[in-house]
Each structure stands twice: as C-alpha cells, then as structure tokens.
Amino acid sequence: MENQPKLNSSKEVIAFLAERFPRCFSAEGEARPLKIGIFQDLVERVGGEMNLSKTQLRSALRLYTSSWRYLYGVKPGATRVDLDGNPCGELEEQHVEHARKQLEEAKARVQAQRAEQQAKKREAAAAAGEKEDAPRRERKPRPVARRKEGAERKPRADKQTSKALRAPREEKHTPVSDISVLTVGQSLKVKAGNNAMDATVLEITKDGVRVQLNSGMSLIVRAEHLVF
C-alpha cells in the first residue's frame, strides 16, 4: 500500500476510473449519465486504492459531470448506469433540463472569453498601427544662405511676389465631433501632425473608427484625429 503511486490531479483520477470501470466512465467521447449516489459506491469499491481520498474522488466526479461531453450525454431517453454499466433508471426531465442550462452557460462563458481576447487583439493591433503611422519629426528649416558681398540685392517687391506665388493655399478642415454621423464608405481625412491623409470609413466601433488609407493600410482612429 505504501508503494502505490499517487494520483495528483482530477484528470488522472478520471483516467484511473475509466480504466477501472470502463462500462461506467470514459476518458473521451460522449459520457453516460451516472447513477445517483455513485460517489458512495466509489468510496466502497476503490477506497484506499491509489492513495485516493474522498476529497479527490469528489473533485474528480465534479469535473467529470460538469464536462461538455457529459452534459451532452444527459438527454431525454438516456439511462443512468452504475460502476459495472448496469442500467439504473431513465433520466428525469428536471435533470435533463438542468444539464441543458449548464451546457448553455458553459458555452456562453467560452464565447465571452473569446470575444474579450479578440477585443484585446484588435486594441493591440490598433495601437501598433497608430505608432506605425505616427508623423515623423518635422525637419528644421534650412538656414538662409547669406548673400555674398558684391551680389546685387533683388527688389523686395519681386521677392514677396514670388513667395506669394509659391505658398500653397492652406486647407481648412472641419473636425469630426460625433462619430455617429459617419457612415461606412464615407471619405474623410486622418490628421497626422500637420498633415491630413485621405481615408475611407470601414467600420464604426466603440473604440473609434476603422478607416483605410490610400496606401491600403487599415487602422482604428479616435474621433479627435478625424476631419472632413
């Protein structure tokens, strides 16, 4: 007895029970509904074996009967079995309904976890996109070359006229104050420093607006970075 290996986890206990009572427990596939009061039967049949305690048996049974494959097996017309696989009565309707609710709740929890993980991935991707599209530092203006001695000074009027001709007309943009007015496919601009890049609205989310730039890159942008 002292040299018997010890089972450390509920999964190991379930594997042991499936090997010891194959007509009752299964390690994979759809499980058969268990006899009511089977815990006491287990204590009497395997008590002391593999150094198993009542707490380990109870935890293993709880894990086994809450698994999806077991809940799938609890359905109308199914029959409970004892440790030797003998039928012990058909399932009652209330037990079937309870198992159905447990299965629905378990699926809902998994879907919620997946949705949360997807949201975190989208936020991380959006943050990476904003960093990638962050405006570069503006270059300092080149120092004006000094006029060489003896060189003729051009008339100031001509210089001002040429500057006026070269100066681009500054575009005026209207900031987007409410993203609810936007629609998918609408054209707008994304502010990046002193520049504004053309973009198209792809999706409006709670985190901002997903847009696609002319370069083909898509990212989520907050409203304060959008203008018409």
Curated annotation (Swiss-Prot):
GO cellular component: cytosol
Basic and acidic residues bias (residue ranges): 117-136, 146-175
Disulfide bonds: none
Subcellular location: Cytoplasm
Gene3D superfamilies per record: ProQ/FinO domain (1.10.1710.10)
GO molecular function: RNA strand annealing activity; RNA strand-exchange activity
InterPro entries, A to Z: ProQ (IPR023529), ProQ/FinO (IPR016103), ProQ/FinO_sf (IPR036442), ProQ_C (IPR035236)
PANTHER family: RNA CHAPERONE PROQ
Family (UniProt): Belongs to the ProQ family.
Role this protein plays: RNA chaperone with significant RNA binding, RNA strand exchange and RNA duplexing activities. May regulate ProP activity through an RNA-based, post-transcriptional mechanism.
Protein name: RNA chaperone ProQ
Native organism: Salmonella arizonae (strain ATCC BAA-731 / CDC346-86 / RSK2980)
Gene behind this protein: proQ
